[in-house]
């Protein structure tokens, strides 16, 4: 029967695409800040028979029978999340960070309520109030942003905007902001205007788990995150909150916006959270930051302008206007030499979102492969050779050769 055959036997077209993707991930430098490589254990959990099990509800209160073992899995994930982040309650069921944000909004807001979020072009996220997203359609969105001179969040201006508009909820967090976020300052602003504070820590969850970035948990009414990126787990979402909001959050997730949870993904989340509790995880996170700073410095030495002047995290935002390139062109040029980045808007960007004036770079994936500061200098050289000499084939070939050497010296997970 079909169900007892291998993937290669059943669907060679899909099997080939997966095989090619394995090759791509191993042969290219992954510098997209939101991407990482999970462990073999996480892959095994996500590819397990738990994908067969429906489990609407929560541990001990399911709408289906036969949930005794998935209850164990989800309970372990919840316990580990609470231990790592010091939270009173954790919901590990959101299928994504976007759905975690949606559930948080629905737990505390009504349609038409005012939310404040970081402007998308200044480093915010679609789900923080962008007009093209559900968050900008269902709620009245008021943006805050960064100072043009420094590229850093203007907290005084943020406070003034909050006093003017009196939002019901302020959203902190970003998808393209390289500096540490001041959650204590955000809490003070929220308290002054009587607003709830929601922090989306998706990009920096791993750094926070390792104690390398201020934790939002003591300051926020609700914290959302993805479970991949720096946390190095499966693609998914999670919500943390004080115990007093547990019932509202759980109800907003199920039955509010989701039905059955993805138990195989929750198992993978549990495994990744277990990995995050080990001493080597902190060492890994420390190396992510060291690598980001080394790469930032090496890029600056080669004439690249960095938004906010550098980085405190895993992420670097490069403004390419002084190079005469758009983000879209740079992304394509780098892909040709086997370096993967994403085009990204920079603050006060004159280019449209599909073009942009910048690229976003992150170090989590290359750090997972074991690369350190010396490799970051080589990566900066590759970027410089590629973007400063786009029409010179010999230079491009040299850049591609450096990438091949780096990838060979730091092998991808063997599957």
Curated annotation (Swiss-Prot):
The record marks 228 as: Plays an important role in substrate specificity. The modification N6-(pyridoxal phosphate)lysine is found at residue 229. One of its GO terms (biological process) is glycine biosynthetic process from serine. It catalyses: (6R)-5,10-methylene-5,6,7,8-tetrahydrofolate + glycine + H2O = (6S)-5,6,7,8-tetrahydrofolate + L-serine. The keyword Lyase does not apply. Its main location: cytoplasm. Keywords: Amino-acid biosynthesis, Cytoplasm, One-carbon metabolism, Pyridoxal phosphate, Transferase. (6S)-5,6,7,8-tetrahydrofolate binds at residues 120, 124-126. Its EC number is 2.1.2.1. Pathway: One-carbon metabolism; tetrahydrofolate interconversion; Amino-acid biosynthesis; glycine biosynthesis; glycine from L-serine: step 1/1. The keyword Transferase applies. It is found in: Cytoplasm. NCBIfam families: PRK00011.1. Homodimer. Belongs to the SHMT family. Catalyzes the reversible interconversion of serine and glycine with tetrahydrofolate (THF) serving as the one-carbon carrier. This reaction serves as the major source of one-carbon groups required for the biosynthesis of purines, thymidylate, methionine, and other important biomolecules. Also exhibits THF-independent aldolase activity toward beta-hydroxyamino acids, producing glycine and aldehydes, via a retro-aldol mechanism. This is Serine hydroxymethyltransferase.
